[in-house]
Curated annotation (Swiss-Prot):
CDD domains: SCAN (cd07936). PROSITE patterns: SCAN_BOX (PS50804), ZINC_FINGER_C2H2_1 (PS00028), ZINC_FINGER_C2H2_2 (PS50157). This is Zinc finger and SCAN domain-containing protein 5A. GO terms for cellular component: nucleus. The gene is ZSCAN5A. It comes from Homo sapiens.
């Protein structure tokens, strides 16, 4: 998957595809989760080439950008590790020498681990040569070129390069490998190869001369957009104002220091994977009216930590600094909060409730994907099935954790007692047994507990709730283990 996503950077073929248009409307989360026909490579190109006019609503532009990122990375289908591999592989293809880019393309590398193993073996691309054409050097795939059939001018160029092939490839640097386009197509040269007939088209050639800055997304995409605007009528908006580095994605244009972005590794195991990159990808039809009223003169910019960390239910979305109305929402990878905060005389800002509410139990959530997954607890829908035992799950990540029980994989190890766990959240809870930490406190009696589940069971003592009912008699219990112990007292259960 990572190699497929990075190929749009390395080959530059997707940028010339006809019909690439930005999404015109914001699709619902259910549409995004079920739309498996969208080519991730096309979404990747649309995401990188996205731009919006100055007159457009920055909030709507930010939502479109969020949708494109969601369709490219597909956090509802991929794990955090796979998404990280996609991003790292993309940057690798941008910043590394062309020799290594060819190595990735030839071997079909799927992950960073595979790429690391490939580089450790000191493998180098084969069947590729450096060709000089009209004063520029290109890395070209060999195709049984017969020098006798080539024109004298081209033959002399090829001979000059062939004598220095090994040294030329080894001396390439990341900054020496791109002109205004990362990947260029040579013009036709007649009678150069029998295999290609009278026309020789270097359709996968890589220019190895140019400006080091051309490797960065901004300059490359701006020039690609200018050259392809006539060929691609779907991209009619002005040139994208893309950042020079990933840190500029979260830096405010006023010159303020960028907020600290929470790592994807900090996402809890029970957090829906779709919320890693989707903050507010879309709304239900009932919430669409509220979403359209977000174009206020001043809009809030949420805290960056809300991208990857699940917020407690019922609490307000963190709110950061505001931006001027003329600024486009292009410097953030998450969507804004549901509404701008209302200023009060005392200087405090009102806390807004999470915008997405369940119509069954009225539970509220910070992003729509959490609400979609929560509704499955009411409908009983379990889309993901284990192919070994047939057990079904509501979330893909739950299925992936379950499959570790079959494979025996326990990637998380306690550094104190060396006990291993299948999930990071289990390890986090286990470490409290060594530290003695009890972060969960009962509001009624101030008793503290190590685990959240223990607190919930304890709170039923105060509320009198007994959700576990016996099917053989009217008795009910506050704990599941008490119900199971009671069921053994019935004759039918004992005989079985």
């Amino acid at each position: 998957m990572a190699a497929n996503c990075t190929s749009s950077w390395s080959l530059g073929e997707s940028c010339n595809r006809p019909g690439l248009e930005l999404p015109r409307s914001m699709a619902s989360s259910e549409t995004q989760l079920g739309n498996h026909d969208v080519d991730p490579e096309i979404s990747h190109v649309n995401f990188r080439m996205f731009s919006c006019p100055k007159e457009s609503d920055p909030i709507q532009a930010l939502r479109k950008l969020t949708e494109l990122c969601h369709l490219w990375l597909r956090p509802d289908l991929h794990t955090k590790e796979q998404i990280l591999d996609m991003l790292v592989m993309e940057q690798f293809m941008i910043s590394m020498p062309q020799e290594l880019q060819v190595l990735v393309m030839m071997n079909g590398v799927q992950s960073c681990k595979d790429l690391e193993d490939l580089l450790r073996n000191n493998r180098r691309p084969k069947k590729w040569s450096v060709v000089t054409f009209h004063g520029k050097e290109y890395i070209v795939q060999d195709s049984d070129i017969e020098m006798a059939e080539a024109p004298s001018s081209v033959r002399d160029d090829l001979k000059d390069v062939s004598s220095q092939r090994a040294s030329s490839v080894n001396q390439m640097r990341p900054g020496e490998g791109q002109a205004h386009r990362e990947l260029q197509i040579l013009p036709r040269v007649p009678a150069l190869s029998r295999r290609q007939g009278e026309d020789f088209l270097l359709h996968k050639s890589i220019d190895v001369t140019g400006d080091p800055k051309s490797l960065r997304p901004k300059q490359t995409l701006e020039k690609d957009l200018k050259e392809n605007r006539e060929e691609n009528p779907g991209l009619t908006s002005p040139e994208p104002q893309l950042p020079k580095s990933p840190t500029d994605l979260v830096r405010a244009k006023e010159g303020k220091d960028p907020p600290k972005i929470a790592s994807v590794e900090n996402v809890d195991a029970d957090t829906p994977s779709a919320c890693v990159v989707e903050r507010e990808a879309s709304t239900h039809s009932g919430n669409r009216g509220d979403a359209l009223n977000l174009s206020s003169p001043k809009r809030s910019k949420p805290d960056a930590s809300s991208i990857s960390q699940e917020e407690p239910q019922g609490e307000a979305t963190p709110v950061g600094n505001r931006e001027s109305p003329g600024q486009a929402g292009m410097n953030s990878i998450h969507s804004p909060g549901p509404a701008s905060p209302v200023s009060h005389p005392d200087g405090q800002e009102a806390k807004a409730l999470p915008p997405f509410a369940c119509d069954v139990c009225e539970k509220r959530f910070t992003c729509n994907s959490k609400l979609v997954i929560h509704k499955r607890s009411h409908t009983g829908e379990r889309l993901f099935q284990c192919n070994l035992c047939g057990k079904r799950f509501m979330q893909l990540i739950s299925l992936q954790f379950h499959q570790r029980t079959h494979t025996g994989e326990r990637p998380y190890t306690c550094d104190v007692c060396q006990k291993q766990f299948t999930q990071k959240s289990y390890l986090k809870c286990h470490k409290r047994s060594h530290t003695g930490e009890k972060p969960f406190e009962c509001k009624d009696c101030k008793k503290v507990f190590t685990y959240r589940g223990s607190l919930k069971e304890h709170q039923r003592i105060h509320s009198g709730e007994k959700p576990y009912k016996c099917s053989k008699c009217p008795r009910a219990f506050s704990r599941l283990k008490l119900l199971r112990r009671h069921q053994k007292t019935h004759p039918e259960a004992t005989s079985q």
